[in-house]
């Protein structure tokens, strides 16, 4: 049965159509926000997937180019693999939804959000996020929703709810907040050094709007929701836990996990698991879930140690940061490099500088984002965690971590006018034991400074964790979580920023939300830790950006030419400019306004290219002197090339002070000669003279 529901959201109408399309999906909602249209669907497999110990949720955000009236590029003119923006949006949708599914649910669930029309005033991410929640809530898939999502901007000191694409370009804050009925469940932000108090206020502005949306969703679910289907739980039998405790008492498990060395801990757990496998060799049912049982036993042990005893697995205090180290210039010949180590997490970041023409082109649905000059790429090889696995390129996690570090650093980068380079940083994970994304922010900051990029301020990142008890007041916030505390804890709250404010936030949780008290404490903790990392480690390693780029980095010079001369510089089919590039070894970019960028490593080549371009772009006058090459000899004279593709003729009578019968008696092909411009001949060609060049020239 088709029903339509509407509400006013941030001055625009949000309309949800139920039962109109995609009726064979478990749940579907056709979302309209202004003229933006997104189809959100939720489907689940009939049976659980065998042999897995995780919930198989897949979230897709599909950008259709017809939504903005474009035909996709490429040979086959079809949408290809998901763009980076689509992947990041999928992750933002996934993170608040995942904790609300049953932890022991093993049926495959797929959420698909298809962007069908884009109104620049209404960001399609909003209806996609809300549509996923609505489609799942009205379906028969087990789900403890709803959740709602709102975006907040900050323009001229005023908060803007669900800013348009144009407003986002002006905003000092791009914040996305998801909430359940009472608590915040997901935060994602990029900011221009927004103070902590302002950030908290913005988070709860969004949370208040989310409560209105949840009441709207409740009405839809009450009228259209299906009864949730029953499923076979894969929970570990309590009898198995009791049997394990008899073989491995709690004190032994505590001793196994209580070490500051990740590999020692993993070896301890392997030994315990092997003993249990031998003990339960005759019980196939228990063996099938033994891995999950040991995991749960570890988890309960670690959480009890932290929550009741305030004892962390590596012996640190609750607010203590792991040992830190920082170095720069560790890799030769790259344009900049730095390594940042935090405990058993180690990141090395390399910086590469290139002309602005190397900026990444973006062909997406956002008409305001067509390119970006700063790119941060994050790599996580299997050896960083002591595993062997083939490398298959960056996955969604790597793309997400790279984007987080990129977002954290963009606010402190110099403008293209101040520093006319495209910039790429690559963070290589050498070792991982938690918080590699935040370590990559620290390493990237120092690498940029070592490369001579004049960033305004250094940026550091830190992550806080959480362990909760039975009540909202029973919790412990942990500063600088390691891998084990992330796996067994309830939160990964990443915050990056400068001394003066926040530049990026990403919060993931595994429970049904955080109270305001926890959010405020986590943000306060990360500020204290960030100050320590910046002051005591990073700024002691490199205090300020170097005042020059690395000797191996390209240099860039700019000149301005008359826009009407661009065609002369480029030449027919690029012949002239390509000849300059080939001859001098530089890279040349010219804008429609006549701004010319010359980029190269060799200063002599850059000077030559600059001289050639200026020569070509000059209006020639009689009396100008050039140095050129004899490129052609005729009976009546010689042709001299004074710039790539530009020639003038020296008549035989203008070659020498005395009479000559043959040009070849004086000149040969390839001779370098100085000529003086005599004007233009009857055919409009440049007329040169060799004999009239002053001796002092």
Give a label for each model feature.
Residues 1-232:
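Long, basic N-terminal domains or extensions that often function
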Residues 25-109, 115-117, 122, 188, ...:
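Glycine-rich, flexible beta-strand/loop modules in the N-terminal catalytic cores of phosphate-handling
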Residues 27-29, 122-141, 328-351, 433-453, ...:
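Conserved phosphate/anionic-ligand binding catalytic regions in large, soluble enzymes, centered on
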Residues 33, 42-44, 61-63, 113-117, ...:
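Flexible glycine-/small-residue-rich
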Residues 140-260, 448-547:
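Mobile "lid/hinge" segments at catalytic clefts and subdomain interfaces of large enzymes
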Residues 290, 552-558, 563-697:
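Single-stranded RNA-binding regions, centering on S1/OB-family and related RNA-binding modules
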